[in-house]
Amino acid sequence: MRQIGETLAVGSVSAALRQVEDVWALPTPGSRDDFPRLVRWFTSRDDPARSSGSAAARALWAIRSAAGQVFGWDRPEAGVGSRVATLRDRLPPDLRSASAGPEFRARPFTPLYLLDDEFAAEVANRTMHAVMHLGWVPDGSGGYRGQLAVLVKPNGLPGACYMAAIRPFRHLIVYPGAMRDIARAWQGLDAR
Protein backbone atom coordinates (compact mmCIF):
# COMPACT_ATOMS: atom_id res chain seq x y z
CA MET A 1 0.00 0.00 0.00
CA ARG A 2 1.24 3.47 -0.79
CA GLN A 3 1.72 5.93 2.01
CA ILE A 4 -1.18 8.36 2.23
CA GLY A 5 1.04 11.35 1.46
CA GLU A 6 2.65 9.57 -1.49
CA THR A 7 -0.75 8.74 -2.93
CA LEU A 8 -2.58 12.02 -2.49
CA ALA A 9 0.14 14.63 -2.07
CA VAL A 10 1.10 14.58 -5.74
CA GLY A 11 1.21 17.80 -7.73
CA SER A 12 -1.76 20.05 -7.17
CA VAL A 13 -3.48 17.50 -4.92
CA SER A 14 -1.01 18.34 -2.15
CA ALA A 15 -2.13 21.96 -2.37
CA ALA A 16 -5.78 20.93 -2.38
CA LEU A 17 -5.65 18.77 0.74
CA ARG A 18 -2.95 19.75 3.16
CA GLN A 19 -4.22 18.54 6.52
CA VAL A 20 -4.49 14.95 7.74
CA GLU A 21 -7.43 15.30 10.08
CA ASP A 22 -7.82 11.74 11.38
CA VAL A 23 -6.15 8.33 11.08
CA TRP A 24 -7.78 5.27 12.66
CA ALA A 25 -6.92 1.58 12.83
CA LEU A 26 -10.20 -0.16 12.04
CA PRO A 27 -11.33 -3.20 14.07
CA THR A 28 -11.65 -5.28 10.90
CA PRO A 29 -9.26 -8.24 11.17
CA GLY A 30 -9.00 -10.31 8.02
CA SER A 31 -6.90 -12.01 5.42
CA ARG A 32 -5.04 -10.45 2.50
CA ASP A 33 -8.08 -10.92 0.23
CA ASP A 34 -10.73 -9.29 2.48
CA PHE A 35 -10.32 -5.68 1.34
CA PRO A 36 -13.07 -5.84 -1.33
CA ARG A 37 -15.49 -6.99 1.39
CA LEU A 38 -14.53 -3.99 3.54
CA VAL A 39 -15.07 -1.59 0.63
CA ARG A 40 -18.47 -3.14 -0.18
CA TRP A 41 -19.54 -2.90 3.44
CA PHE A 42 -18.25 0.67 3.84
CA THR A 43 -20.00 1.99 0.72
CA SER A 44 -23.31 0.24 1.46
CA ARG A 45 -23.72 1.52 5.04
CA ASP A 46 -26.74 3.54 6.07
CA ASP A 47 -26.66 7.21 6.96
CA PRO A 48 -24.82 7.49 10.33
CA ALA A 49 -27.52 9.83 11.65
CA ARG A 50 -29.89 6.85 11.61
CA SER A 51 -27.58 3.86 11.98
CA SER A 52 -25.08 4.72 14.71
CA GLY A 53 -25.31 2.50 17.79
CA SER A 54 -24.53 5.52 19.97
CA ALA A 55 -27.44 7.80 20.89
CA ALA A 56 -24.97 10.65 21.46
CA ALA A 57 -23.49 10.19 17.97
CA ARG A 58 -26.97 10.06 16.40
CA ALA A 59 -27.84 13.30 18.22
CA LEU A 60 -24.66 14.98 16.97
CA TRP A 61 -25.39 13.86 13.40
CA ALA A 62 -28.94 15.23 13.72
CA ILE A 63 -27.63 18.57 15.02
CA ARG A 64 -25.07 18.73 12.19
CA SER A 65 -27.76 17.94 9.62
CA ALA A 66 -30.07 20.65 11.00
CA ALA A 67 -27.23 23.20 11.06
CA GLY A 68 -26.35 22.23 7.49
CA GLN A 69 -29.91 22.95 6.40
CA VAL A 70 -30.12 26.26 8.27
CA PHE A 71 -26.75 27.55 7.01
CA GLY A 72 -26.88 25.95 3.57
CA TRP A 73 -23.64 24.01 4.10
CA ASP A 74 -24.74 20.91 2.21
CA ARG A 75 -26.53 22.32 -0.82
CA PRO A 76 -25.59 20.63 -4.11
CA GLU A 77 -23.85 23.78 -5.36
CA ALA A 78 -21.41 23.49 -2.42
CA GLY A 79 -20.25 19.99 -3.37
CA VAL A 80 -17.79 18.22 -5.63
CA GLY A 81 -18.18 19.31 -9.24
CA SER A 82 -19.76 22.62 -8.21
CA ARG A 83 -17.89 24.60 -5.53
CA VAL A 84 -14.79 22.43 -5.92
CA ALA A 85 -13.46 20.46 -8.87
CA THR A 86 -13.04 16.74 -8.38
CA LEU A 87 -9.58 15.61 -7.33
CA ARG A 88 -9.81 12.64 -9.71
CA ASP A 89 -8.62 14.89 -12.54
CA ARG A 90 -5.48 15.75 -10.54
CA LEU A 91 -4.47 12.21 -9.59
CA PRO A 92 -1.33 10.71 -11.09
CA PRO A 93 -1.98 8.76 -14.33
CA ASP A 94 -1.89 5.31 -12.71
CA LEU A 95 -4.61 6.27 -10.21
CA ARG A 96 -6.65 8.19 -12.77
CA SER A 97 -6.73 5.09 -14.99
CA ALA A 98 -7.82 2.85 -12.08
CA SER A 99 -11.47 2.16 -11.36
CA ALA A 100 -13.13 4.92 -9.33
CA GLY A 101 -14.73 2.24 -7.17
CA PRO A 102 -18.29 1.71 -6.00
CA GLU A 103 -20.76 4.52 -5.40
CA PHE A 104 -21.90 5.18 -1.83
CA ARG A 105 -25.47 4.15 -1.13
CA ALA A 106 -26.39 6.72 1.53
CA ARG A 107 -23.48 9.13 1.90
CA PRO A 108 -22.40 12.19 -0.10
CA PHE A 109 -18.99 10.78 -1.12
CA THR A 110 -17.73 10.63 -4.71
CA PRO A 111 -15.34 7.72 -5.38
CA LEU A 112 -11.84 8.68 -6.59
CA TYR A 113 -10.01 5.38 -7.08
CA LEU A 114 -9.99 1.73 -6.04
CA LEU A 115 -6.86 -0.43 -5.93
CA ASP A 116 -6.22 -3.89 -4.45
CA ASP A 117 -5.57 -2.39 -1.02
CA GLU A 118 -6.77 1.24 -1.20
CA PHE A 119 -10.01 3.10 -1.79
CA ALA A 120 -10.40 6.88 -1.76
CA ALA A 121 -13.50 9.03 -2.03
CA GLU A 122 -14.06 12.78 -1.71
CA VAL A 123 -16.75 14.98 -0.24
CA ALA A 124 -17.19 18.74 -0.19
CA ASN A 125 -19.59 21.21 1.34
CA ARG A 126 -19.42 24.86 2.36
CA THR A 127 -17.15 24.06 5.33
CA MET A 128 -14.48 21.85 3.71
CA HIS A 129 -13.25 19.53 0.95
CA ALA A 130 -12.10 16.13 2.22
CA VAL A 131 -10.81 12.77 1.08
CA MET A 132 -11.60 9.58 2.95
CA HIS A 133 -8.79 7.07 2.36
CA LEU A 134 -9.49 3.44 3.27
CA GLY A 135 -6.51 1.10 3.23
CA TRP A 136 -5.86 -2.58 3.94
CA VAL A 137 -2.65 -2.94 5.95
CA PRO A 138 -0.73 -5.75 7.69
CA ASP A 139 -1.75 -5.96 11.35
CA GLY A 140 1.62 -7.13 12.68
CA SER A 141 0.40 -10.63 13.55
CA GLY A 142 0.13 -12.21 10.12
CA GLY A 143 -3.27 -10.80 9.21
CA TYR A 144 -4.64 -7.55 7.83
CA ARG A 145 -6.97 -4.78 8.99
CA GLY A 146 -8.51 -1.63 7.64
CA GLN A 147 -7.06 1.81 8.18
CA LEU A 148 -9.09 4.97 7.73
CA ALA A 149 -7.57 8.39 7.11
CA VAL A 150 -9.34 11.67 6.47
CA LEU A 151 -7.51 14.50 4.69
CA VAL A 152 -9.17 17.92 4.81
CA LYS A 153 -8.90 21.37 3.34
CA PRO A 154 -11.14 23.71 5.37
CA ASN A 155 -13.03 26.31 3.35
CA GLY A 156 -11.51 29.56 4.62
CA LEU A 157 -11.54 30.79 8.21
CA PRO A 158 -15.17 29.72 8.82
CA GLY A 159 -14.31 26.20 7.67
CA ALA A 160 -11.19 26.09 9.85
CA CYS A 161 -13.22 27.26 12.85
CA TYR A 162 -15.90 24.66 12.11
CA MET A 163 -13.33 21.84 11.86
CA ALA A 164 -11.70 22.96 15.13
CA ALA A 165 -15.08 23.16 16.87
CA ILE A 166 -16.17 19.65 15.89
CA ARG A 167 -12.79 17.96 16.55
CA PRO A 168 -13.46 17.12 20.23
CA PHE A 169 -16.90 15.71 19.39
CA ARG A 170 -15.44 13.54 16.60
CA HIS A 171 -12.67 12.20 18.81
CA LEU A 172 -14.67 11.72 22.02
CA ILE A 173 -18.09 10.65 20.70
CA VAL A 174 -18.39 10.02 16.96
CA TYR A 175 -15.28 7.96 16.20
CA PRO A 176 -15.29 5.76 19.34
CA GLY A 177 -18.94 4.89 18.67
CA ALA A 178 -18.18 4.33 15.00
CA MET A 179 -15.32 1.96 15.88
CA ARG A 180 -17.67 -0.09 18.09
CA ASP A 181 -20.27 -0.14 15.29
CA ILE A 182 -17.64 -1.19 12.74
CA ALA A 183 -16.33 -3.97 15.01
CA ARG A 184 -19.87 -5.33 15.57
CA ALA A 185 -20.75 -5.15 11.89
CA TRP A 186 -17.46 -6.77 10.83
CA GLN A 187 -17.96 -9.62 13.32
CA GLY A 188 -21.48 -10.03 11.93
CA LEU A 189 -20.07 -10.33 8.41
CA ASP A 190 -17.68 -13.03 9.65
CA ALA A 191 -20.60 -14.95 11.18
CA ARG A 192 -22.37 -15.17 7.81
Q: Which residues are covered by each model-predicted region?
A:
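Short C-terminal domain-edge/linker segments immediately following a structured domain
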Residues: 56-57, 150-154, 177-184
